[in-house]
Curated annotation (Swiss-Prot):
The gene is pgk. GO terms for biological process: gluconeogenesis; glycolytic process. It is found in: Cytoplasm. Its main location: cytoplasm. InterPro entries: Phosphoglycerate_kinase, Phosphoglycerate_kinase_CS, Phosphoglycerate_kinase_N, Phosphoglycerate_kinase_sf. ATP binds at residues 197, 319, 345-348. PROSITE patterns: PGLYCERATE_KINASE. This is Phosphoglycerate kinase.
């Protein structure tokens, strides 16, 4: 990829505009989860160390576009950054017609979604943003799949458009996992519905050696294999699709294994009693909420021998401990594996946290939708823009 990297540029005395993903939860004016803010700090600190005058922009929440709403103000983010960085940090509310920023200072722009035209990638808005800087840095992988004024349009008009360290790191990790993976390659795709991940399953079934399906997705594959799934969440209209994916994988020597044992209950609740059953013994009134220990061990063995692991989605309802053993075993196997592993998606990251394996996963992706679209083989607009500007 012919993308310019911020780390390679001379930024001394330059006005540098960084698009970060600082969309964090806020309660009573205080940031309640700072993972994205912490992830952005090295990029901001590097720009400061290189002698830049730094401007930072992001969206926060989903305000009505074009309307100021104090509930979605960037002020709590500014307060956090002011403590985390050893330099002056301030909020700029009216910045589109120009903003004063000194070398060694950080100015955070108010929520980009307060600007009319942000979502539609408005050209006039993009040009105004571009006019504010000498160098535009796209560092928000989580929004790279959206063609918006602050993620795409501005980069088309800025004097220089480059990738920040966080984005570059993400693209390197995904490239390593998907473009030239060490074999065998194993993908674990969980989630409630085949329909929401069909293109991911399609894409991965063409490149992996083993495609492990979990959650509601697995129920559709279990039904496709001819077993009763009782009252489980599954998609009857996608059984033929599941059969086709299994046949396609087999035709190229790959496999989509179906669980041999499952954990069931009569209701979906934190207090539901879990029962272990063979996959062939699920009764009409039961729901499958996890894979059984035999299936978990079989999958752990597959993971242990892998060269590359891509994990997107749990294999059971791990939020309830009685249905979490399958996901826990998978997490342990990934942690113990010597393979290059990449994990992404909200539920997956919650499982990584719950089972304490964050430091054992080679790379944790910060992008939800962008991670999925990359797995689908789709071109991400922000990445395409950076390639065009780098050519």
């Amino acid at each position: 990829m012919a993308i310019i990297n911020m780390s390679d540029l001379d930024l001394q005395g330059k006005r540098v505009l960084i698009r970060e993903d600082l969309n964090v939860p806020v309660s009573n004016g205080v940031v309640t989860s700072d993972a994205r803010l912490r992830a952005s700090l090295p990029t901001i600190e590097l720009a400061l160390a290189k002698g830049a005058a730094v401007m930072v922009m992001s969206h926060l929440g989903r305000p009505t576009e074009g309307e100021y709403n104090p509930e979605y103000s960037m002020q709590p983010v500014v307060d956090y950054l002011a403590k985390a960085l050893s330099c002056p940090v301030r909020l700029a509310t009216d910045y589109l017609d120009g903003v004063d920023v000194a070398v060694g200072e950080v100015v955070v722009f108010e929520n980009v979604r307060f600007n009319v035209g942000e979502g539609k990638n408005n050209e006039a808005l993009s040009q105004k943003m571009a006019a504010l800087c000498d160098v535009y840095v796209m560092d928000a992988f989580g929004t790279a799949h959206r063609a918006q004024a602050s993620t795409h349009g501005v980069g088309m008009f800025a004097p220089i458009a480059c990738a920040g360290p966080l984005l570059a790191q993400e693209l390197d990790a995904l490239g390593k996992a998907l473009d030239n993976p060490a074999r065998p390659m194993v993908a674990i795709v969980g989630g409630s519905k085949v329909s929401t991940k069909l293109t991911v399953l399609e894409s991965l079934s063409g490149i992996v050696d083993q495609l492990v399906v979990g959650g509601g997705i697995a129920n559709t594959f279990i039904a496709a294999a001819g077993y009763n799934v009782g009252k489980s969440l599954y998609e009857a209209d996608l059984i033929d699709e599941a059969k086709r994916l299994v046949a396609n994988a087999k035709s190229r020597g790959a496999d989509i294994p179906v669980p041999t044992d499952v954990v069931v209950a009569g209701e979906f609740s934190p207090t539901a009693a879990a029962t272990l059953k063979s996959v062939s013994e699920v009764a009409d009134g039961e729901m499958i909420f996890d894979i059984g220990p035999d299936s978990a061990e079989a999958l752990a063995k597959i993971i242990e021998s892998a060269g590359t692991i891509v994990w997107n989605g749990p294999v059971g309802v791990f939020e309830f401990d009685q249905f979490g053993e399958g996901t826990k075993r998978i997490a342990q196997a990934i942690a113990d594996s010597k393979a290059f592993s990449i994990a992404g998606g909200g539920d997956t990251l919650a499982a990584v946290d719950k089972y304490g394996i964050a430091d054992k996963v080679s790379y944790i992706s910060t992008g939800g939708g962008a991670f999925l679209e990359f797995l689908e083989g789709k071109e991400l607009p922000a990445v395409a823009m950076l390639e065009k500007r780098g050519a």
